[in-house]
Design a protein with these regions (language model features):
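NTP-dependent small-molecule kinase module
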Residues: 2-30, 131-132, 172-175, 194-246
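Short hydrophobic/aromatic beta-strand immediately N-terminal to the Walker A/P-loop
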Residues: 38-39
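Conserved lysine of the Walker
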Residues: 48
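Post-Walker A helix-loop "phosphate-sensing" segment adjacent to the P-loop in P-loop NTPases
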Residues: 57-65
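Conserved nucleotide-sensing/catalytic segment adjacent to the nucleotide-binding pocket
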Residues: 62-63, 71, 75-119
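ATP-dependent NMP and nucleoside kinases share a basic, alpha-helical "lid"
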Residues: 123-176
Length: 246
């Protein structure tokens, strides 16, 4: 049985609730904050991964490289896998990447694939759990190519670098990290990496919020990005570990 005060209290509660729900700033306090999502692209060897890692440290971000989303080639004989075009947009399972970014944007964890570059396959029965974070950085040569990906970004970066610099860096990386030979890296660069960069990667620079030079000092590239984020109000003072002149 309702007491004589309960109807009035119920009406007051309903009025206050409706007022609160109609107040976007107040309502925002109740909702989980969507992460700031940055897209970072550039040709292979341009320096984009180095920049992405430094920005990840500066912004306490989660880094999501496109490299983990290469399609698994376990259905092909090993001798055929190395001849696939890994620089074409179809080589990546970009629909899964979009799904994972959307889930992280909704503050849900994901199970990210683990890719083995020596066998060109995904490691079976193994994933890495990636938890949501206030800042998410999506990095890869084609990070600015796919329209569904670009639609998720709040800010995007393109790293520009000359072909010869890119090739030399790619040789050094693939020999050290991916168990390849210099001959195979040069052959792939001429056959697919450079042609695909001309077709898909370099044109995607037009979608970038800011372009930095991969031959510049790393701290200057980081400074340019952080300054632009500040100017756009996407990063608050004190939100990163470095210093930016205001």
């Amino acid at each position: 049985m309702l007491t004589k005060h309960e109807p009035a209290l119920k009406d007051l509660f309903n009025r206050e609730r409706n007022r609160f729900l109609q107040d976007p700033p107040a309502l925002q306090l109740l909702l989980p904050q969507r992460p700031l999502i940055l897209g970072l692209a550039g040709c292979s060897g341009s320096g984009k991964t180095t920049l992405a890692r430094e920005l990840t440290a500066q912004l306490s971000a989660t880094l999501l490289p496109l490299d983990f989303y290469y399609r698994c080639l376990s259905h092909l004989p090993p001798e055929e896998r190395a001849f696939q075009n890994f620089d074409h947009p179809d080589s990546l399972e970009h629909a899964l990447l979009v799904q994972h970014i959307e889930e992280l944007a909704d503050n849900c964890s994901i199970e990210r694939p683990i890719y083995d570059f020596t066998t060109h396959t995904r490691v079976p029965n193994r994933t890495e759990t990636i938890a949501p974070a206030p800042v998410l950085i999506v990095e890869g040569i084609l990070a600015l190519h796919y329209p569904p990906l670009r639609a998720l970004y709040d800010f995007s970066i393109y790293v520009n670098a000359p072909n010869e610099i890119c090739l030399n860096r790619r040789i050094y990386r693939d020999l050290r990290e991916r168990g390849r030979t210099e001959e195979s890296v040069r052959a792939q660069f001429d056959a697919t990496a450079k042609p695909m960069a001309d077709l898909y990667v370099i044109p995607s620079a037009q979608h970038a919020t800011v372009t930095v030079e991969g031959t510049d000092a790393l701290d200057w590239s980081v400074e340019q990005v952080l300054q632009r984020l500040h100017q756009l109000g996407l990063v608050r003072p004190g939100q990163h570990t470095g210093s930016v002149d205001q």
